[in-house]
């Protein structure tokens, strides 16, 4: 948990004033949300899912509720409700039966279920009553699934940047590590570790994995375009951090990937503003209007025609207050610091 303020600063420095945390150590993220809301810690507004709901062999044991029977669901959902989560996150280990039961119990508490992936078969997953997918996914989405999503109001978060990370396509050219949204908020040792990682020659297995990641990215881009063309709510997401996916800067990269996928710049921007608010069913932000939250990003340029202009930030306004972005930059004197352990630097 060391360095949390640096991560919050990275988000704000990039103009990200609202986030959705889709899985975390619950007391930690819950307290962080509370302290930010109380004004004792500077950071973006946090929506959270708390621990994820997974099957008997959880993918992320430290942050999971292990579900092996439907009998456990009422207690788990009640705990999440008492903890004031905003949504419930269902992970890949849940069977269709358990996922259906989770949706049923969550709805009793007026909680919506976001599901991690499409692995059960997208149409079948949609029929369980979920509210959204946490990732667009790389299997090619079927016309039936698109129809069901539109009929039932099921949304999706994007996270194309994660698939780009799997392909390591972005690490072919590392100039972006010197750009302000990365360089000004990231410890130098982290950037050095990523450069070392990028320079390492891949094994045959790694080359195969990278090629597979590139195909998955291209398929996910097709899916995003189809969802947007079908007028389904698609909201920006990054799943940061992954190699080459940074908190804050990753949102700007995601917008660029969405434009590469065929969205117009304004459609891409909408995924990070209006659509994000629609995803969270919150009418107090997402568009500029009298009475809405004064969270604003003022930039130099014309992002309606050049999406990369979102990076040229003039001013960030959070809850009506202009932020001093200089104070958000990384400062080794104030950061608690920690050794890079168990990371790409050690691989």
Language model features with spans:
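Hydrophobic faces of well-ordered beta-strands that scaffold small-molecule active sites
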Residues: 19-21, 46-50, 88-90, 113-115, ...
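Divalent metal-coordination and catalytic microenvironments
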Residues: 15, 46, 84, 106, ...
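Acidic, glycine-enriched loop/beta-strand segments at the rims
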Residues: 218, 246-249, 264-269, 277-313
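Divalent metal-binding pocket/active-site signature
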Residues: 85-134, 139, 163, 218
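Alpha-helix-loop-beta-strand connector modules within alpha/beta enzyme cores
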Residues: 34-52, 99-118, 155-158
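Active-site neighborhoods of metal-dependent hydrolases
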Residues: 76-94, 137-261, 333-347
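Metal-associated gating/positioning segment near the N- to mid-region
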Residues: 1-40, 59, 97, 122-128, ...
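Active-site mouth loops of central-metabolism enzymes
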Residues: 1-2, 58-74
């Amino acid at each position: 948990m060391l360095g949390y303020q640096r991560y919050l600063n990275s988000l704000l420095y990039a103009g990200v004033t609202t986030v959705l945390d889709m899985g975390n150590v619950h007391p930690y993220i819950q307290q962080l949300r509370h302290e930010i809301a109380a004004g004792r810690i500077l950071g973006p507004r946090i929506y959270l899912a708390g621990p994820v709901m997974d099957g008997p062999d959880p993918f992320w044991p430290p942050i999971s509720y292990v579900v092996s029977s439907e009998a456990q669901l009422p207690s788990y959902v009640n705990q999440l409700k008492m903890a004031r989560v905003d949504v419930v996150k269902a992970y890949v280990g849940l069977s269709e039966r358990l996922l259906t039961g989770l949706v049923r119990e969550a709805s009793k508490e007026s909680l919506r279920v976001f599901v991690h992936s499409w692995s059960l078969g997208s149409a079948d997953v949609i029929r369980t009553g979920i509210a959204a997918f946490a990732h667009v996914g790389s299997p090619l989405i079927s016309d039936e699934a698109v129809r069901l999503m539109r009929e039932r109001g099921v949304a999706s978060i994007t996270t194309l940047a994660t698939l780009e990370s799997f392909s390591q396509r972005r690490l072919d050219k590392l100039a972006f590590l010197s750009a302000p949204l990365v360089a000004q908020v990231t410890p130098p040792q982290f950037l050095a570790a990523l450069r070392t990682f990028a320079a390492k020659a891949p094994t045959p297995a790694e080359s195969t994995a990278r090629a597979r990641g590139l195909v998955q990215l291209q398929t996910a881009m097709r899916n995003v375009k189809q969802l947007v063309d079908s007028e389904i709510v698609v909201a920006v997401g990054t799943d940061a951090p992954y190699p080459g996916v940074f908190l804050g800067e990753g949102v700007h990269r995601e917008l660029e990937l969405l434009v590469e996928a065929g969205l117009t710049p304004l459609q891409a921007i909408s995924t990070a503003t209006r659509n994000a608010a629609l995803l969270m069913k919150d009418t107090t932000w997402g568009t500029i209007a009298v009475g809405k939250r004064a969270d604003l990003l003022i930039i130099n340029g014309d992002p309606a025609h050049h999406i990369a202009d979102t990076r040229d930030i003039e001013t960030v306004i959070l809850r009506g207050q202009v932020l001093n972005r200089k104070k958000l930059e990384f400062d080794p004197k104030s950061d608690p610091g920690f050794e890079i352990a168990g990371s790409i630097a050690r691989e």
